[in-house]
Amino acid sequence: MKPGKSITIMLIIVSTVFISRATVNRKEYQEPLNVFIANSSINALIRKETSEAQNYVITYTSEDQKIKTERKESQQGGDSTSIEKRGTPEPSIAKPITSNPELGAEIAYIRGVNDRFPSYKRGATKRWPIASITKLMTALIAEEYIPKETKIVFTEHSIETEGTAGSFVVGDVFLKEDVISAMLVTSSNDAAVALARNLGKEKFMQFMNEKATTLGLRNTTFADASGLSYLNQSTAEDLFIFMKYLHLIHPEILEITRLKEVKIKELETGTVHEISNINALVTRSDYVGGKTGYTDEARQNLLSLFRDRDSNYTIVIILGSANRFDETVRLYNWHENR
């Protein structure tokens, strides 16, 4: 065989192998990933195909286990909204950090909903009292276990709870949805306790902690529905998973949290309560929703979801802060401009 002919054959073989490998790699890259969650404890990338987001909940498992789904019985009815229709994009990799933001919070965490890793984290696995952020789980359990048209009665026990937000009195009767709105918008402790007592406090707490386990929130515990107890604790990594779950599966809860004000009607007297949101970020057009929290032990907490002009969603977590709103905005701006 002539030398020139031998070189030509070798080039053809090498080119064929290269094209074949490139084709395989391209197929692997383009394989759809409809939902992914990085479990806080094991950093496992979870894959799940679903077309009925409202009718299924996600069970998070380790990498060597198969993904499980469990059928959720809806108390509300109505059409479900598929995750696929919302168009979850391929996960992106966070850009390299150029400099750290100046923050005084005990715990700070920011991560794009579809990013594999946070762009900034401080104390991400440290357990911390989350205060009224607890009410997001209270709302979730109330939506899943209390029928939509249920009338919630405010008892003396409910009204005796610390705090007066919502201006409720003993004997008030409201529809469940209105009580949830008051709880999320003005952070009413009375409303949270009234919801829990509808099912019974022990059963309600059981449902809250079972839901945390189901979602893979391994470092999260709940002791009451209001968040007043120091034992309502979580981590930034767990809160990221929880907020992402609400965003994908229960966006209606976050929609309530960004309302500037709500009007709810007492059913016995017809009295209308006008309630304003205590979250300063609801005036921002890019704010999707979230929840404030404060106790003396926890200091100022804030869990937030933002959406930029390209419809990219970002979760920001600030715990143990002296100025939660300022530090949340500072961290989000740093993330967007780095």
Segments predicted by a language model, with ranges:
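Penicillin-recognizing serine hydrolase domain
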Residues: 2-7, 23-107, 200-338
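Hydrophobic membrane-insertion alpha-helices, especially the h-region
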Residues: 7-21
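Extracytoplasmic Gram-positive cell-surface binding/anchoring modules and repeats
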Residues: 101-105, 124-127, 132-133
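Short, conserved catalytic-motif segment at the N-terminal edge
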Residues: 114-124
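Active-site SXXK
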Residues: 115-116, 129-153, 239
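Short, well-structured active-site flanking segments
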Residues: 144-157, 250-258
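Acidic helix-start/capping segments at beta-turn-to-alpha-helix junctions
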Residues: 153-165, 229-230
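Conserved catalytic neighborhood of penicillin-recognizing serine enzymes
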Residues: 161-197, 273-289
